[in-house]
Each structure stands twice: as structure tokens, then as C-alpha cells.
Amino acid sequence: GVNINLGAHGQLQGLGAHWELWMLEQGGMTNMQALRAATMNGAEYLGMETEIGSIKEGKLADLIIIDGNPLKNIQDTENVTHTMINGRLYDAPTMNEIGNKETKRTKFFWELEGSGNAYPFYQQTQSFMRPVCHCRM
């Protein structure tokens, strides 16, 4: 047989990773097999099973805490309450660091005043309304 891994083709993970996990279960895997595909199989494929993929002393502390039991309901993987990255614990809804050192997260670039605000320019010039061809005939 072959190992099945959860993963994308280069795009960032996100909600799609949960959907893919759920589809593995819908395709016939047990919840444990699907969770293994999302964790340990990928670590083994990368040759990093001694560093990542499961919870064990000495491994990197990157994990999520879920409100629910994905072994009973695989869709509980969506109910992330906390995330641990490199041993630092974060509150999932706020993304603030909690635990030993409480730190409020900084704003993302799209939350900054005026970021990505090209619309007034296009509204003034009406250039978003006109088809433009820069080719030479």
C-alpha cells in the first residue's frame, strides 16, 4: 500500500485543509487514519518524523487544541481554540499570545490604515470602468 498525506500543491493551508481531511473520512478512511494523514504521514514523507508529526518530548511543539473529539466527529477539527507554535501558546480567535508571556498580536498589513486602498484613485480616474489595450496595432 501507499501512505496518503494531507496537503496542497503549494498554496497556503487554511480551511481547505479541514475540508480535505473531511473528504479523506468520506472516502473511507477512519478518523484516526485521516488524522494520521494530516500529521504523522507528512512528517515521515519529509523525513522529519523525529521532529514533527506527533506529540512527544523533544519534538517541536507545534499543535492545535480542539474543542471536540475528531476521533468521533472529524469535522471537530474546525473548532480550534488554541494554537501552539514552537512552544508558544496562542488564543485562536484573537491570535494573542497567552500563557507564560501574554502579548497582543500586531495588526496584519491589511488592517493598517490605508493599506490596499487604491479604490479612490480608480474612482477618480474611472480607469477601472474603461477597457484598456496597451497593444500596438
What are these regions (language model features)?
Residues 52-54, 69-73, 111-114:
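Short, charged low-complexity intrinsically disordered segments located at boundaries
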Residues 1-66:
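His/Asp/Glu-enriched, well-ordered alpha-helical/loop segment
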Residues 1-27, 93, 98-107, 111-137:
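Active-site neighborhoods of metal-dependent hydrolases
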Residues 40, 44, 60-101:
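C-terminal cap of metal-dependent C-N hydrolases
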